[in-house]
Each structure stands twice: as structure tokens, then as C-alpha cells.
């Protein structure tokens, strides 16, 4: 559906390239495998920071237990959620918003929508606010990642999917959170916390976003935005 939409709505002769899945100018984009691996490594780095602070603070214990079923589920989560959601949010939605609002406002708008769609509104105001901000920052990080990869979506897929799959593995047996672990640290959500809404997650995402902005500025790309990057 989306490739056909890109071909008709955007008058693209290479709709998959416009969506960031394959490259119209492959010499300027990282290979899908390299970009996917880069995204996975960034996700692993973020989760390592969060888990390390949790362990050092005494709010969890390292168990290191994981089985084949959990690994299989993690891989499916990584590729399924990462591919589907990035194709929708950073592939299609961002391009549509760019056409209506321009590159900068389009990036903010897609991150805002991404945050609202994923936030749990049954939480208290403070917890919900932290989660909204964390998810917004993640949406901006993913947009910057696509920009830095010259329109390729594969690093975004690896980063997004890696965070989902990695946190699933941590909660499934690698890391046991204490029942009294503070929400400001592990994130809101009670027994199923989202670390992106906690202090460590927020600070880590903000630092990553600043690093990405510097990298994009240094690259001095001639055009910005999801469509132009494609």
C-alpha cells in the first residue's frame, strides 16, 4: 500500500527508495545491513546505560537468564515492530508532514504524534508527562538518525526494534527489577515500566539527540527532511 501511495501521491518512480527501504543513490547511503547493525548498537548502548544505573543504584539484580523462545520472540519483535512502525512514522508520516509543514516542523509533528500514539494515558499526570517527553525525544532521535543516514530507514529500524526487543529480554530474565524500584529511575508503568520515561532514559536520549544534531550539522547536507533525504 505505502509504495503505491508514494508512487501516486509523491510522483516517485522509486517508491521504496522514497520510503527509505532501498537507496536511489546507494553510494551515498549505508548498506541496509550496516545501517541496521548501527541502529542495534545504539539501542544496546542506551539499554546498557539504563541497566547499569539500575544495578549500581541497587534497584535490580542481574540474572542473565534467557532461553531460545525468548530470543526468538525478541528477534520477531525487533524486526516486526521496528520495520512496521518506522515505515509508518519515519517513512510515510514524516514525508507527508514535511510536505504540509516543512522539514523542521514536520520532524517535530511526527515525533509528537509518535509520542501520543505510544503513551499510556492511564498513568498519573507526572508519569504520563515523563513518558510523553521520552517518546517525543525518541521520535526526534529516530528522525535525526534517518537524516544522518541520507534517507535510509534501516538504522531507525535497528534502533527502534532494538530498544523494544532489548527491553523485552531484560524484563524476561536478564534483569530482575526490585519491587520498590523508583519510577523516576526505571520509568513509569508499575510492573511493566517504560525506561524512556525515567530520568536516565530521558537524559540519555537528550544527549544522543545533541550528538546527532552536531553530526548532521557537520555533514553539511544540502537538504533536510525525510523526502529530501530520500
Language model regions located:
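Hydrophobic core of alpha-helical transmembrane segments in multi-pass integral membrane proteins
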Residues: 1-6, 43-55, 196-216
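Juxtamembrane helix-loop-helix connectors linking adjacent transmembrane helices
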Residues: 12-88, 94-100, 184-185
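Hydrophobic alpha-helical transmembrane segments
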Residues: 36-41, 71-75, 104-109, 129-133, ...
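Small-polar-interrupted transmembrane alpha-helices in polytopic inner-membrane proteins
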Residues: 47-50, 78, 82, 102-119, ...
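Aromatic-anchored segments of alpha-helical transmembrane domains
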Residues: 47-53, 111-121, 161-173
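Membrane-interface helix/loop boundary segments of multi-pass membrane proteins
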Residues: 84-109, 144-152
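Functionally important transmembrane alpha-helices
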Residues: 128-187
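C-terminal membrane module of polytopic membrane proteins
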Residues: 161-230
